[in-house]
């Protein structure tokens, strides 16, 4: 649909349905097995045009309100993690997501987490 802000930037095969985006978020959090920041989650879903930024932000908010995900603090950083309801949702509905979307999301997540780990281990101080 022309002018639909929730589909701008979505690549062919990407997700346009908000319920599928919610499933993707729960699936990602379950699959990586650790809480992720908004920035990391957004980078994962935006990398291959899996969904639109505004649809992602809306889905994340809805999941918080519905109790599927929670926020945990790591210093000053807010991280998102699945609740038991989010894990159950991912397990029940992950097959609704196209295999290509699941594979791209996990591939990007693995690369991003490796990059974050490298950066945290290789701190440089300039004197």
State what each model feature region is.
Residues 1-32:
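Short alpha-helical segments that sit at the start of domains
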Residues 18, 74-96:
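Short, cationic-aromatic polyanion-contact patches
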Residues 34-45:
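Short acidic, hydrophobic short linear motifs in intrinsically disordered regions
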Residues 50-65:
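Short amphipathic alpha-helical interaction segments
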Residues 64-74:
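A short, conserved structural fragment
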Residues 88-103, 109, 113:
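Winged-helix/helix-turn-helix nucleic-acid-interaction surface
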Residues 103-127:
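Exposed, interaction-prone assembly regions rather than primary DNA-binding/catalytic cores
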